[in-house]
């Protein structure tokens, strides 16, 4: 199975602008059908999984986060029970060393660091809402140990690989690295202590991974692997989530990506991994809003400027047109659960329910 199948999981959503009630009824119906389909795919014990019963930890964390975006919490709302079951499933699989997930399970897919990162993200948001004292203390302990494991798993170059640096011979990979950066940020936002030097090392790592053209390479240790637009978009979203909207590095990355993913070709993309490339790109353009691009590039022509309204109109129409009658979308090889989570994330960017998604 291709390593790129989980690239699209590597980034958080950024910054709300409008409430979901501003969506036309047609798109609200698309979201409702998609969420109803997604919860039907949840197993009785609370987990989701991808095709071939793979990536259970990552899919469970991502599915739970999508339901949180709807506005439900672990206590209240239409999907509160689904959220609680997902959280319980992950909490029951914490290892002594702090890893969230079973490193020996067949359904870990390519490696356990993806699932670990997304589990930190999901549980950090649960922790911020948990009112039960005993359960809150348990979550704090889990997240503290999970952060410590994440820091120990970092490679000497500042990135992360599919498994820890010790288990993976210090191998790094861009999409996994960004997953861990976002996980650490979510934990810090929730009040968990996160060593600053680990995040600083990753920032330097991403700089070193950037080519003269502005694209990010696949791996620093392996000497490259070519420029990857998907990882580059993920890096922009990661940079934006830290408040660095106009850094020179973010500008270089965006200038590299923009001609490769034109808004005019939404739904007609001629490159691989378009679902998760747009998963990233939607987040980036959403953060830019209507005037963010011109603030980054004051000399840009009006026809060049990326705006959320323009992108949203094109992509939401595509999602409405391609949704199946049961609420699903046809999936890439990793499966329909993953595809639905990507698309439902994009469709709910305007909700702005969770602190981690706010400017």
Language model segments and positions:
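Calcium-coordinating acidic loop motifs
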Residues: 42-43, 324
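Bacterial N-terminal signal peptides
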Residues: 4-15
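Small side chains
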Residues: 8-10, 64, 87
């Amino acid at each position: 199975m291709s390593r790129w199948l989980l690239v699209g999981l590597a980034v958080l959503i950024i910054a709300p602008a409008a409430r979901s009630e501003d969506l036309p009824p047609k798109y609200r119906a698309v979201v409702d059908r998609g969420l109803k389909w997604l919860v039907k795919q949840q197993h009785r014990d609370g987990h989701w999984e991808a095709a071939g019963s793979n990536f259970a930890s990552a899919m469970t964390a991502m599915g739970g986060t999508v339901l949180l975006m709807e506005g439900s919490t672990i206590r209240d709302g239409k999907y509160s029970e689904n959220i609680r079951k997902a959280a319980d499933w992950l909490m029951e699989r914490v290892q002594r060393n702090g890893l969230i997930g079973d490193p020996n399970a067949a359904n870990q897919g390519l490696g356990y660091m993806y699932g670990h990162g997304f589990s930190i993200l999901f549980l950090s948001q649960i922790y911020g809402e948990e009112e039960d004292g005993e359960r809150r203390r348990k979550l704090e302990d889990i997240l503290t140990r999970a952060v410590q494991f994440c820091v120990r798993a970092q490679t000497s170059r500042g990135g992360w690989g599919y498994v820890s640096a010790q288990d993976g011979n210090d191998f790094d990979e861009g999409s996994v690295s960004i997953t861990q950066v976002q996980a650490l940020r979510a934990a810090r936002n929730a009040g968990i202590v996160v060593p600053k030097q680990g995040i600083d090392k990753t920032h330097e790592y991403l700089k070193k991974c950037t080519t003269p053209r502005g694209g990010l390479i696949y791996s620093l240790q392996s000497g490259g692997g070519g420029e990857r637009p998907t990882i580059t978009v993920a890096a922009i979203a990661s940079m934006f989530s830290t408040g660095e909207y106009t850094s020179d590095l973010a500008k270089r990355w965006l200038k590299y990506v923009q001609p490769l993913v034109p808004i005019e070709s939404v739904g007609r993309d001629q490159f691989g991994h378009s679902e998760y490339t747009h998963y990233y790109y939607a987040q980036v353009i959403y953060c830019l809003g209507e005037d963010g691009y011109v603030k980054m590039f004051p000399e840009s022509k009006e026809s060049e400027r990326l705006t959320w309204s323009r992108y949203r109109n094109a992509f939401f129409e595509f999602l409405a047109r391609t949704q199946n009658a049961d609420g699903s979308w046809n999936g890439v090889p990793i499966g329909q659960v993953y595809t639905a989570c990507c698309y439902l994330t994009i469709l709910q960017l305007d909700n702005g329910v969770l602190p981690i998604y706010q400017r």
